[in-house]
A protein has these predicted regions:
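A detector of single, family-specific signature residues
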Residues: 1-339
Length: 339
């Protein structure tokens, strides 16, 4: 069952694969993106099944609009896969589909589920959901505070600023600061009640340049890297993958796609700059890049990508950062020949 989700509605497409390996697509239906629509989906799905065989739902992670349906299906013991948009896009490019509608997208997701072996979706823990909500709230409040600071500074240096306006701007700044402190306290309380989460976050903060706020943002925005299966997929999800456009004699310079999670790219920039002052490995890596590319900006972006993939590795392997580790220096275990 492929499901294309929008803000208010979603379209479902039923399909099956026959013994001859031919794909057969059945009916499509549209439902409201509400609890009532979810119940109607299960009833409609049961009518489409010719036999009592399990149905696998394939959903694209479209913003936050898919979450209610995904949790509903999981709570009702339904098997489903939640796919990152870039994975669905790459599959669509491999097909001959040129048009794009909700119905065609639902059919495409159905076809993807029939042709590929997809990982089952595991709902994020309540702690990770709360961590993501608090991390996003903190980033939003921080950005509001930065804009308000610039606005107050500009108004203060204008001709004859109104003292009452300056006072109101100061009150707004203090309010945002109070909210930021409350969010930080909520984060501290959460980590105190979730020692396992706090322990794994400590692995990330052991990297020079990665602070607790950055570590929280990375883990929260990837929901503990649950939807990521490889370093390449992670870089693409964040928009730090390298793309190049070349045709004939026209060849553009390689650049990052920037078609990913902007929150993560924003969160990784300052840590990358900081690591170029305190992390010897990143300093050496940056120097090698600058020897080939004099412009410093691509080097900083490469350090951002390296820090992101390092966080992924430390989280998955569940161990802290080792500045002396290098894969080339590891002793290979040889298998003794059988006598």
């Amino acid at each position: 069952m492929g499901i294309d989700i929008a803000k208010d509605t979603f379209v479902a497409c039923f399909g099956r694969i026959e013994a001859s390996q031919h794909l057969r697509f059945g009916k499509q239906a549209s439902f409201t993106n509400t609890a009532a629509g979810f119940e109607e989906l299960l009833t409609w799905t049961a009518r489409q099944q010719a036999e009592a065989a399990p149905c696998w739902f394939v959903v694209e992670a479209t913003g936050v609009y898919y979450e209610e349906l995904a949790y509903f299906l999981a709570d009702n013991a339904q098997e489903l896969s939640v796919l990152l948009p870039n994975k669905v896009k790459h599959f669509a490019q491999s097909t001959e589909q040129k048009s794009k509608t909700d119905q065609l997208d639902a059919r495409l997701l159905c076809r993807l589920g029939l042709e590929r072996v997809l990982p089952a979706w595991q709902p994020p823990t309540p702690a990770l959901r709360q961590l993501r909500a608090l991390a996003r709230e903190r980033q939003s409040v921080t950005q509001q505070g930065a804009r308000l600071k610039i606005r107050r500074h500009a108004y203060q240096h204008s001709y004859q600023p109104d003292s009452r306006t300056l006072e109101r701007l100061s009150v707004q700044q203090q309010l945002l600061l109070t909210q930021l402190q409350a969010i930080d306290q909520d984060l501290a309380d959460l980590l105190q009640t979730e020692p396992e989460l706090a322990r794994k976050l400590a692995h990330l903060t052991s990297v020079p340049g990665i602070g607790l706020t950055t570590a929280i943002t990375v883990v929260a925005e990837t929901t503990g890297f649950a939807l990521v299966g490889s370093e390449r997929q992670l870089a693409s999800y964040v928009g730090l993958d390298v793309v190049q456009h070349q045709s004939g004699l026209s060849a553009g310079a390689p650049r990052i796609s920037r078609r990913g999670n902007v929150r993560l790219r924003t969160a990784l920039y300052l840590p990358a700059v900081s690591s170029l002052r305190h992390n010897p490995q990143q300093i050496a890596f940056y120097a090698r890049l600058c020897s080939r590319h004099p412009s410093g900006k691509p080097g900083v972006i490469a350090v951002m990508r390296k820090l992101l993939l390092l966080c992924y590795s430390l989280w998955k392997q569940d161990h802290p950062y080792d500045p002396h580790y290098h894969p080339a220096h590891q002793v290979r275990k040889e298998i003794a020949p059988v006598a």
